[in-house]
Amino acid sequence: MGHEDNEEFFKGRGAQVNTHNKFLKNKYVLEHIEGLDEPLLENTATQLFEETPKKIVSESNSPDLSHMYSINPYQGCEHGCIYCYARNTHEYYGFSAGLDFERKIIVKRNAPELLEQYFNKKNYKPVCILLSGNTDCYQPVERRLKITRSLLQLFLKYKNPVSIITKNNVILRDLDILTELAAMSLVHVNVSITSLNEQLRQKLEPRTVTATGRLAVIQKLTEKGIPCRVMAAPIIPGLNSNEVPSIIKAAAGRGALSAGFTIVRLNGSIGEIFTDWINKAFPDRAEKVLNMIKSCHDGKLNDSDFGRRMSGEGKIAESIHQMFKMACNRFMANREMPEFDYTLFVPKNGKQTSMF
């Protein structure tokens, strides 16, 4: 039984509850989010909040991350992916990691200005910067605000490498900039595909582009010479784990050069949000899926241990690893993403970077 049979399921959003913010003194957990008598939900439309940060490039020292530097022009994400690890960051802003994460979006309009300042630091050496480390830089609001596009114009101006991860076809709007970046080996695009099953996609990621649409993004980018990787992430044992080969095959058929994956982990409030969701969306297999996730993370839903937190361990995790490896060997043999060119960077003084 899916959520079609469950009257408690709130359609159009991922989270079914607004969980308690651990940073707030008074606890209030909102469970019946479509109740007509709930005064706190008079407006369920997406709201924008502006932040004016003093810096925009974040640095990570996590040993299991391939990108050490990232920019998040937005916090919160209207896509509503139920599993999103970035949900917990919303609590720092005084919001809930649940429904608030999907409908209260924080925008950083001064991000381009801050990036230009970053590039012009006296001792700056070019590094690949990820768009974005937390939430999708091409989520729906980007269509109107164009903050990501402005950032890409700066990456092109200074000829600094950039890696993008998205699940939205809004990226195709910026083909003009991306094509120029690709011609100089300055861009990689990672397209996230969690499931080819449209019914499952609608439950997991209610406001995202269909898998068919994302495959079309890979194909169109590839046709323009823009290198693409598919991210089959996250893999949720018992929900989409059987789709790993088909996702990689489909992406390879559209031109993807490589693939990656992660196994879901449910840290902080996400464990409560996901548990509530799966009991409403898939009550017939909720307990089994939760136990399978735990088996990949030392008996817990959450996992912060480097090396294991994103790849898991144990029999189920190992079977997923083997499935992924076999699919890559079969469908992506002799393919690889091109290297970035760091020698083209043009700082404020106009002199190109020397790597020697």
Question: What is the role of each PLM region?
Answer:
Residues N240-S246, I273-D276, N349-S354:
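Short glycine/threonine-rich loop-to-helix capping motif typified by GTGT followed
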Residues Q199-R207, A233-I235:
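Surface-exposed cleft-lining segments at the edges of enzyme active sites
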